[in-house]
Amino acid sequence: MNSFRFTKMHGLGNSYIYVNQFEEQLPEERLAEIAVKVSSIHTGIGSDGMILICPSEKAPVKMRIFNNDGSEGKNCGNGLRCVAKYAYEHKLTEETSFFIETLSGLVKADITEDNGIVREVAVDMGEPRLTKKELPMLGNEDERTIDETFVFGETELSGTAVSMGNPHIVFPVADINQAPLTTLGPVIEKDPRFPEGVNVEFVETVSADELHFRVWERGSGITQACGTGACAAAVASVLNGVSERNRDITVHLAGGDLVINWQDNGHVLMTGPAETVCSGVYYL
């Protein structure tokens, strides 16, 4: 294979290169290598990673995520919205409500479309996993990490750990513009307490229904948005008594806004946009 077709899409600036594996069938042994190449802003297309849209025996499509360092991720909220948009607009499904298979399980997407163009996607992200075993995180397997003190060098932070199919640690800050994202993000991501690494979020509370958010993503670094991270931030806000269940929480990310609702049934609903940037042919 010397080339393949791609579509670049983004959810609030969190951009990926999307490849339709129904048609292209990139070789398994080269996926990590290709993800690194296409993600490069200098020698590739430029993105936070690569997402494959694959056939599934359980749903209309399956999503596989590769970070820009070549590692494979389990879940991506912004990616899910873009996959839902792609699947509907490219006739991989004719339904406006359908499931997407991920490494974390089946996820339901509901789209809002106008003349065949998807304008907004609501994704049922399922129930948050909160125990150390589910994250995973070292320590007592059945314990939760809520408002726990963490010390990184000379910096002390209070963190809440949440998995949305991938691990997150959420730290409240007084001023989001002063969050130590570049200095502590890469340190916390690889903290040995998180054996699979962790996504790092800093959150400033505006009100019970409004949060400012910045993220250092595992395997990708600073990104404009992280859907699962926004979900984790909203869940952490509820767990710490700041927000309430079954209420819309607007999360302001660097790339735009998501609306998160931790419903009474235990599931987290994420609603936001998905955009197509361009499409073309990439030469290996």
UniProtKB/Swiss-Prot annotation:
Assembly behavior: Homodimer.
Provenance organism: Bacillus velezensis (strain DSM 23117 / BGSC 10A6 / LMG 26770 / FZB42)
Entry's transmembrane regions: none
Keyword Hydrolase recorded: no
Site positions for Could be important to modulate the pK values of the two catalytic cysteine residues: H168, E217
Keywords associated with the record: Amino-acid biosynthesis, Cytoplasm, Isomerase, Lysine biosynthesis
Pfam families documented for this protein: DAP_epimerase
PANTHER family hit by this protein: DIAMINOPIMELATE EPIMERASE, DIAMINOPIMELATE EPIMERASE, CHLOROPLASTIC
Gene that this sequence comes from: dapF
Enzyme Commission designation: 5.1.1.7
GO cellular component, one term: cytosol
Catalysed reactions, semicolon-separated: (2S,6S)-2,6-diaminopimelate = meso-2,6-diaminopimelate
Chief site of localization: cytoplasm
HAMAP family: DAP_epimerase
Residues noted as binding substrate in the record, renumbered to the chain: N14, N67, G77, N78, N166, N199, E217, R218, G227, T228
Protein name: Diaminopimelate epimerase
Protein family according to the UniProt entry: Belongs to the diaminopimelate epimerase family.
Keyword Acetylation belongs to the record: no
Active site: C76, C226
Localization, UniProt: Cytoplasm
Chain's role: Catalyzes the stereoinversion of LL-2,6-diaminopimelate (L,L-DAP) to meso-diaminopimelate (meso-DAP), a precursor of L-lysine and an essential component of the bacterial peptidoglycan.
